[in-house]
Amino acid sequence: MAEQPAGQAGTTDNRDARGDREGRRRDSGRGSRERDGEKSNYLERVVAINRVSKVVKGGRRFSFTALVIVGDGNGMVGVGYGKAKEVPAAIAKGVEEARKSFFRVPLIGGTITHPVQGEAAAGVVLLRPASPGTGVIAGGAARAVLECAGVHDILAKSLGSDNAINVVHATVAALKLLQRPEEVAARRGLPIEDVAPAGMLKARRKSEALAASVLPDRTI
């Protein structure tokens, strides 16, 4: 068997290693694009980014925290709090935590079902349903939660602390207190017409009819 020169063998090995690196680079790029495609299905809002420090024996170690809201714009929303040495990593951790804490918000015609007040630490947020066309009347932190949840018409007011973290958690606490008219009617043993206003029921029937008319187009 003919022996291959040492120089030629080294060149072949270098080419193989270079090809492996290029293949891994292409695969990693494809994976990042796929992850970007997954993220595009959700609404993401970064409410606050803070730089924090930890005092250790050798001095101070700085890191960043990010408060992130993630929702599908159709009743699902979650809140995440990420911490890392770099801002993008902190946001990514916040997004991952927010997706793990998803919960469903009962909506009728783009607004909430009834007035509710949520409290978290020193934060107090009051939410009231609004008529179509009102819009989201809320501050920055509460607005991010409501928009990601898919609320289009609502009146919100902060009655406590102005801290963004407290306001966000108070808003989430208020949304988790919402109940559907069917639940209240079943608990009281009454028909739903005696529990929910006629305008609310009409708006729900209209939204259900609209969703039913759009659904066949999405399945094609």
UniProtKB/Swiss-Prot annotation:
Q: Which residues form the S5 DRBM domain?
A: 42-105
- SUPFAM superfamilies, A to Z: dsRNA-binding domain-like, Ribosomal protein S5 domain 2-like
In the record, N-acetylalanine modifications are located at 2
Q: Where is the region Disordered?
A: 1-39
GO BP term, example:
translation
Q: Which Gene3D superfamilies match?
A: 3.30.160.20, 3.30.230.10
Show the domain comment: The N-terminal domain interacts with the head of the 30S subunit; the C-terminal domain interacts with the body and contacts protein S4. The interaction surface between S4 and S5 is involved in control of translational fidelity.
Q: How does it assemble?
A: Part of the 30S ribosomal subunit. Contacts proteins S4 and S8.
Stored PANTHER family: MITOCHONDRIAL RIBOSOMAL PROTEIN S5 (PTHR48277:SF1)
Q: What is this protein called?
A: Small ribosomal subunit protein uS5
Natural source organism = Mycobacterium tuberculosis (strain ATCC 25618 / H37Rv)
Q: Which gene encodes it?
A: rpsE
